[in-house]
Design a protein with these regions (language model features):
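Transmembrane alpha-helical segments of polytopic membrane transport and secretion proteins
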Residues: 1-42
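Cytoplasmic-entry segments and transmembrane alpha-helices of multi-pass inner-membrane transporters
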Residues: 35, 115-154
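Membrane-interfacial helix termini and adjacent extracytoplasmic/periplasmic loops
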Residues: 66-95, 150-199, 281
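Transmembrane alpha-helix signature in integral membrane proteins
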Residues: 92-122, 251
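Residue-level signal for discrete positions within transmembrane alpha-helices
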Residues: 97, 101, 137-140, 144, ...
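Faces of alpha-helical transmembrane segments in polytopic inner-membrane proteins
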Residues: 112-115, 139-147, 184-210, 241-242, ...
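Transmembrane alpha-helices
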Residues: 145, 205-209, 216, 225, ...
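Interhelical loop and adjacent transmembrane-helix boundary motif
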Residues: 265-302
Length: 302
């Protein structure tokens, strides 16, 4: 009879280790197809944006060649025609609309971003249970509201309340040129438009900030608590520094929507071809509302 020799420890380990497999860099056919589809999709977006920029550049070249720098520095918008309907003289200037766009968007960011960040912090670290689910659902739903609803709400409901606050700001801060008014006309001002835009961007910035704050590493939060930090101190020392980049990105996204908003601003703001730096005075406009105003009657040059 043969006696079975027990395997040594090294022989047992060598038997348990599988043979090394050959590593190949050749991708599968499915990976090649997926990569091609993704590449085509990404490049098509760049091509479409490039074609749009090229189209706008070609169409606007004639106006820029005639108006030159006055297209940005002047605020006149006049088209004179003769009896046959032919254009005899035209003057185009976007200065008033550019300033109105800047003021309305700036007011929206100043009011909306702090409220959105505080709301995101509350939803992430303080709200619990059904209250959190309800608030998150409402904020996500508000982000999908069409701008026309915000415009009508601002015109019908908000304008009276905002007019009161505008008068209050003018009363106590009227010595600052920005809050001074040449005439007591407070309705349909850049301030009211900025408040409406702030309410519009709050859901967007809140949703983005909440997602960023949710991604804060748990070990950093627990380390802050282990060192004796309170929840407020933990938020200031850990969450805010970690999510600063995401909050800035959300604010820029909200700023982009505020600067490109059309219907809501057109509903609550007078389109006046006059440079107005007084945010409480009922005159101004923005570029998007000018496009909406002139869309139906614009000539080839406009």
């Amino acid at each position: 009879m043969y006696k079975i020799q027990p395997m040594t420890l090294m022989e047992n380990r060598s038997a348990a280790i599988p043979e090394p497999r050959e590593v190949t860099t050749k991708p599968r056919r499915s990976d090649q197809i997926f990569r091609a589809v993704v590449t085509i999709g990404g490049m098509s977006s760049l091509v479409i944006l490039g074609l749009i920029a090229l189209f706008l550049s070609i169409k606007g070249f004639n106006v820029l060649r005639v108006e030159q720098l006055s297209f940005i520095t002047e605020s006149k918008w006049e088209v004179l025609q003769d009896g046959e309907g032919k254009i005899t003289e035209s003057t185009f200037g976007l200065a008033a609309m550019l300033i109105g766009t800047f003021l309305s968007a700036l007011i929206a960011v100043i009011i909306g971003v702090p409220i959105a960040v505080l709301s995101a912090l509350y939803l992430t670290f303080y709200a619990r249970g059904s209250v959190k689910k309800l608030l998150v659902s409402l904020i996500d739903l508000m982000a999908a509201f069409p701008s026309l609803l915000f415009g009508f709400w601002g015109f019908i409901v908000l304008m009276a309340s905002a007019e009161y606050w505008a008068k209050l700001l003018n009363k106590y801060l009227g010595f600052i040129p920005l809050f001074d008014v040449p005439a007591p006309i407070f309705t349909r001002s850049p301030f009211i438009a900025g408040v409406v835009l702030a309410i519009m961007i709050i859901p967007i910035v809140t949703a983005i900030s909440r997602e960023i704050f949710d991604q804060t590493p748990l070990d950093r939060i627990q380390a802050a608590y282990a060192l004796g930090a309170s929840k407020l101190a933990m938020i200031r020392a850990v969450v805010i520094p970690y999510g600063r980049g995401g909050v800035v990105g959300g604010a820029m996204l909200g700023l982009g929507r505020a600067m490109g908003e059309t219907v809501a601003v057109y509903t609550v703001l007078n389109v006046v071809y006059q440079i107005n730096w007084q945010v409480l005075f009922g005159a101004g406009g923005n570029v998007a509302s000018l496009i909406l105003l002139k869309f139906g009657e614009a000539g080839p040059q406009e």
